[in-house]
Amino acid sequence: MDKKLKLEVKNLTKVYHGAGGKDVVALDKVNLEVKESEFVMIVGPSGCGKTTLINIIGGLDTATDGVVLLDGKVVTEPGADRGMVFQGYSLFPWLTVQKNVEFGLKMKGIPAAERAKRAQEFIELVGLQGFENALPKQLSGGMKQRVAIARTLANEPQVLLMDEPFGALDAQTRVVMQELLADISRRTGTTILFITHDIDEAVLLGQRIYVMSRRPGTIREVIDVNLPGERSHNSLVLPEFLETKKKIMDMLWQESSEAAMGR
């Protein structure tokens, strides 16, 4: 049985009006679909509009043309139905792990006992039990990002939007976080749209990958990822993984080469 269509981007265009009346087209007629409980990745050359796209989906920016639909309803502003995790940890430095995770729940008016219980569930989900009373300055980068993920998931968004959330982490911590997120996706069924410049990350985590062209950004190709077994660092050496990785690398190399030659 086909899964329900959760998120849809239709003919989305973004034009920035520059000085001297010169327009810059950042996105050009982008079309994208994410089904319920699906893990979808977006990759593309630097400057192709990936972050602009996810900001429009999140309601942080507006499109010049086109539309974003969540459960068939037009998205025009930020909302609790979309949770966002960025490369920066965006934690409140004066709040403990527990209080950071509880913050959104408190803003919703959820009673103290209930929000403490729910926050604890998500702290355990990301493996930070025992650090409830720690401040962000006492945590490593990977631990801070775990808190950010727990805080976002605690608000139970319908879609989790992630913009290079592991980009600032060292290679070893990044792999640990990738495996953690893959496990969370399996256990919770959260719908995830994830931007990355890391092709390994895209193939490891994604069920489908949207490959964007250079600016003006549009969707060049959609790739289904079929890896056997559960996703882990062991998946990185599978023939299916390497074949998909090469296909994407060849596309991005072609984009870079054409840009360098001014085509």
Question: Could you describe each region identified by the protein language model?
Answer:
Residues 102, 106, 113-130, 183:
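Conserved ABC ATPase "signature" region
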Residues 43-45:
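The feature captures the beta-strand-to-loop junction immediately N-terminal to the Walker
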Residues 134-137, 155:
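Conserved signature/switch motifs of ABC ATPase nucleotide-binding domains
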Residues 149:
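Hydrophobic anchor residue at the start of the ABC signature
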Residues 160-163:
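Catalytic Walker B motif of ABC-type/P-loop ATPase nucleotide-binding domains
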Residues 66-78:
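Conserved ABC transporter NBD signature motif
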Residues 95-103:
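Short coil-to-helix segment of the ABC ATPase nucleotide-binding domain corresponding to the Q-loop/switch region
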